[in-house]
């Protein structure tokens, strides 16, 4: 199931094409994805990256999409992988208290926010690297949503004559997609920043968006946002290709809640979602953790 099919199925099951409902389908889908990804570990949640440590620098920045560590290895000068053991910060500080305690790192700890970006994380290594070793991290992250054509970036034409303020949750108009809203900052009577609340769906690069003057203080003109990139132009994902019932019933549960539907319908779709999740869990934490050689073939007991 791709996003176009999922988008239509949600409308068909919910029997609604009301514009506000349709504009929020991408939100229903993203909420379902978040529930799935935080419940079952599946292959599409893992990513592998390599980087380089800085000699005499005990800190390592985590990838911007990092959620948690699967493994962290330092590659020695002869190509040998040395997998680091996860410890807490106190252990590393106590074991290697001096800046001169250098060598091939053996341990790592999730340290906290980076100095340059409070929203991103960093690791503490012990001992401090004595050379610029290559490091390989296998980690969990949120894969790209199945939502097709969500806004990613663009170029602002600020316009003139607007009332200075921060305008929240402003609907964006125009383009080939729908449903996008943003916080728009106006300074010096011109638009200076656009921060998405809802990235919408079905936009394409080259779309030119704007916003109603009525939503921007009632005065001013000529603000434009030219889309330069969107997310997932094909509207596909591993979940959509392999376990679409999880996405469908998860999104429908959110849709019924949005519609203020009857509690029994919420419970119905929740049950359907949980049944689908049992199948996915069988794969993610069952079949993929073993094989027939090690665990034997699955079979049922037959009475003689």
Question: Can you say where each PLM-predicted feature lies in the sequence?
Answer:
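Glycine-enriched, solvent-exposed interface loops adjoining structured elements
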Residues: 1-148, 231-304
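Conserved, function-critical positions that sit in or immediately flank catalytic
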Residues: 148-231
């Amino acid at each position: 199931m791709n996003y176009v099919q999922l988008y239509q199925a949600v409308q068909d099951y919910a029997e609604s094409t009301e514009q506000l409902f349709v504009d929020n389908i991408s939100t229903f889908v993203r909420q379902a994805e978040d529930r799935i990804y935080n419940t079952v570990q599946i292959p599409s949640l893992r990513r592998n990256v390599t980087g380089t440590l800085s000699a005499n620098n005990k800190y390592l920045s985590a990838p911007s999409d990092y959620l948690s560590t699967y493994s962290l290895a330092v590659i020695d000068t002869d190509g040998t992988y040395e997998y680091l053991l996860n410890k807490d910060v106190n252990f590393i500080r106590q074991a290697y208290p001096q800046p001169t305690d250098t060598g091939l790192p053996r341990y790592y700890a999730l340290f906290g926010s980076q100095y340059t970006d409070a929203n991103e994380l960093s690791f503490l290594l012990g001992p401090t690297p004595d050379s610029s070793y290559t490091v390989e991290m296998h980690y969990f992250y949120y894969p790209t949503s199945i939502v097709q054509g969500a806004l990613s970036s663009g170029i602002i034409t600020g316009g003139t004559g607007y009332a200075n303020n921060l305008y929240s949750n402003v609907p964006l108009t125009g383009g080939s997609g729908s449903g996008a809203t943003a916080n728009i900052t106006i300074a010096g009577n011109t638009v200076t920043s656009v921060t998405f609340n809802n990235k919408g769906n079905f936009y394409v690069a080259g779309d030119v968006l704007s916003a109603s003057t009525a939503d921007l203080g009632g005065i001013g003109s000529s603000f434009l946002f030219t889309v330069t990139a969107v997310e997932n132009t094909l509207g596909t994902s591993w979940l959509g290709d392999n376990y679409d019932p999880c996405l469908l019933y998860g999104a429908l549960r959110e849709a019924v809640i949005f519609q203020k539907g009857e509690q029994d319908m919420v419970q119905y779709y929740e049950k359907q979602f949980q049944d689908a999740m049992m199948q996915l869990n069988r794969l993610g934490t069952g079949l993929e953790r073993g094989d027939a050689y090690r665990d034997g073939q699955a079979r049922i007991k037959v009475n003689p």
